[in-house]
Amino acid sequence: MKICLIDETGAGDGALSVLAARWGLEHDEDNLMALVLTPEHLELRKRDEPKLGGIFVDFVGGAMAHRRKFGGGRGEAVAKAVGIKGDYLPDVVDATAGLGRDAFVLASAGCRVRMLERNPVVAALLDDGLARGYADAEIGGWLQERLQLIHASSLTALSDITPRPQVVYLDPMFPHKQKSALVKKEMRVFQSLVGPDLDADGLLEPARLLATKRVVVKRPNYAPPLANVATPNAVVTKGHRFDIYAGTPV
C-alpha cells in the first residue's frame, strides 16, 4: 500500500523503514495521507488538512484512559450488547477493529478480545498503540492477556479463527450523511484512508457461523441493518444501535 512515510524522530536508526517493510507500505512522496513516526508514537495525518492533526492509538492516556476510569464500564452499550453479565465475560473477535476503542472497552471490562484489521496502516497504528499499552505499568499486565491484534481481512479470516469466540463484533465504516461538517476530525482523516466498507454485507454470514453465541453489529441509527437482515434484538443509544444476531452453537 502506498502512503507518504515521514520520520520525525531524528534518531536516524531506520525504524520507519523496518516498520514499512513489516506492514508492506511503500513511500509515496505525493500521497495526501502520511504515516508519521514521531518521538512519542506513530500517527496518521491528512497532509492537505494539517489542522485536523494526527491520529494515533493511545490505550494509556487521553480519552481511552478517561473512559476506562470514568466511563460506564460494564454499563456501556457495547458491553451490554455483547452480553456481559455477572461472571459471564465472553471471548470476543472484533472483526472491524479500526482504532480499537470498542475492543479496549470490552477488554477493560474483562473480556478477551482478538482484533482483526485488514488495512495495513490502521494495523500499524493499532500495533504501535498496543506496544505502548503492553509496556505500561498500570494496564500492561491485563492488556497483554486480553487484547491481541490479527492483521487480516475479516472476509477470509473469519472462517479460520480458532478457538471460536462466543461473540463476533462488527462496526463497519458507514458513509456519513452529507453536510456532515461536524463529523469528528478524526473520522474525516480515517475515512480518507479507508473509505466506507463496501463489502461489509459479506461479513454477517461468516460472523454468525464463527460466533457460538451472538453477533453484534454497531450501526448509526439512520443506517439500514447490515446485509438488510433485520433483527428485533438491539441495544439502542442516542446515535447508534447495536443489532444482535444469533450465532451458531458448538
Swiss-Prot record:
Q: Which GO terms describe its cellular component?
A: cytoplasm
The protein's matches in Pfam families, at most eight in alphabetical order, are given as:
SAM_MT
Does Methyltransferase count among this protein's keywords? yes
Q: Which residues form a coiled coil?
A: none
The record's EC number reads 2.1.1.242
Q: Where in the cell is it found?
A: Cytoplasm
Q: Which domain of life is it from?
A: Bacteria
Q: Which positions are annotated as binding S-adenosyl-L-methionine?
A: 101-102, 117-118, 153-154, 171
Recorded GO molecular functions are: rRNA (guanine-N2-)-methyltransferase activity
Q: Which family does it belong to?
A: Belongs to the methyltransferase superfamily. RsmJ family.
Which HAMAP family does this one have? 16SrRNA_methyltr_J
Role noted for this protein: Specifically methylates the guanosine in position 1516 of 16S rRNA.
**Protein's UniProt name:** Ribosomal RNA small subunit methyltransferase J
Question: What is the organism field in this record?
Answer: Escherichia coli O127:H6 (strain E2348/69 / EPEC)
